[in-house]
Regions:
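Structural signature of nuclease core domains in nucleic-acid processing machines
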Residues: 1-172
């Protein structure tokens, strides 16, 4: 993707470059969605207070660059832990239990679009309960849980992208 160019008030420009580890694209009848994934060697999550402080802008910057290059909507910005998980247990576990525990350790963390259809595209086996892939939870009523899902609306993603640009201007 092309670098992001931000015009400063003093007439200068800031050019931001980086390498996106992974971009997933999903299409619906009406729209095309992207999910930005950053590989990490430790467990990491997006903390909105860190975004607010200008300390955690990388994934939002990548999202902004990808959205400007293509006609796409954000589906999520996520971290994927690459460390081989160690499962500890005081009891004997079946292979299935061990696999479930490993899946939990590899679950991506971050922000996703709070849209049940998009969530189900990210985890096509999710019917009810917690996703083993993304930070989402579908309740017994079949709706996306607002308290157990790290979800934001399209408007909130737009706001976060605008805020990221504002912070970069301020710190440049």
């Amino acid at each position: 993707y092309s670098p992001i160019i931000i015009d400063l008030e003093n007439g200068k420009k800031v050019e931001i470059t980086g390498k996106i580890d992974r971009i997933d694209i999903a299409k619906t009848v009406e729209d095309k969605y992207i999910r930005i994934i950053d590989y990490k060697s430790s467990v990491k999550n997006i903390e909105l207070n860190s975004v607010y402080a200008g300390l955690q802008l990388q994934l939002l910057t990548y999202l902004d660059a990808a959205c400007k290059e293509e006609d796409v909507l954000p589906a999520g910005v996520l971290y994927f832990n690459l460390i081989d998980p160690i499962i500890k247990s005081s009891k004997n576990m079946s292979e299935e239990d061990i696999e479930n525990e490993i899946r939990k350790k590899f679950k991506m963390q971050g922000l996703i679009l709070a849209d049940i259809n998009i969530v189900k595209m990210m985890d096509n086996k999710l019917e009810k309960g917690a996703s083993t892939i993304v930070p989402a939870y579908i309740g017994k009523d079949g709706d996306l849980s607002q308290t157990k899902t790290s979800g934001v609306s399209r408007k909130q993603f737009e706001y976060l992208q605008k805020y990221m640009n504002k912070i970069i201007k301020q710190i440049s």
